[in-house]
Every structure is written in structure tokens, then in C-alpha cells.
UniProtKB/Swiss-Prot annotation:
Signal peptide stretch: 1-32
Annotated spans, Disordered: 47-69
HAMAP family found in the cross-reference section: UPF0482
UniProt family annotation: Belongs to the UPF0482 family.
Species annotation: Yersinia pseudotuberculosis serotype O:3 (strain YPIII)
Protein name: UPF0482 protein YPK_1977
Amino acid sequence: MMKINNLPRLIRAFLPATLLMLPLVWQTPALAQSASCTQGSTCVSVGGNNDPMSKEQARQSQQQWDETNRLRNKMNNRVEKDFDKNDRAVDAKDNCERSDNLNAYWEPNTQRCLDRLSGRKINP
């Protein structure tokens, strides 16, 4: 029978060995799972996955992401351009309405400041 005062010494002796073995025990189920990973199932693998099918899927995924990103950038640029256009039109309307020129009026369809007498564009 083991004495109780030897228990802390045994714990100090086996604890480092147990901690070193824990990662090996942790990895064993992961290695077993990777062997049974099939097409269409959700599997996560770390390391060298060099089969051509996964490379093709990664390439297609990257290509789709690039196209989506390009379209998103085009849409953002268009929205920004429209916003800037409307912002300039509001500023031009304010300038036209505050103009000292009594013949200046704002044409909402063309978003320009025009002369009442000639119909030509003016810069107030």
C-alpha cells in the first residue's frame, strides 16, 4: 500500500509526462477523422492537402470572391459618383437661387442655372 505522503511526489513526477502526452491523445481523433473524410462532407484539414480537386475548388472559390469583390467595387463607385453628382447639383441650385442676377433661375430637369432671357446656362 502506498503512503499518503508519497502522493505529492508522484503527482510531481507524472504531471509533466501527462502534459506531454495530452497533445498526442488530442490529435489521434483528428487523424482518424481525416482518413474518413469524403467528398461532400464537411471536413477541416490542416497541412498539405495537395489533391487536384481541392486546388480546383480553392481556385474557383478565389475566382468567385474576386468577381464578387470587383462587382461590389463597381457598385460602390457608381453610388459614390451619383452621390457626388447630386451633391454638386444641390450646391449649384443653392448658388443659383442666392445669385444677385435677377434673370437666373434653376431648371430642375437639367439641373442647371439658366438665364430667363436667353435660356443659356450661366454661372452665378
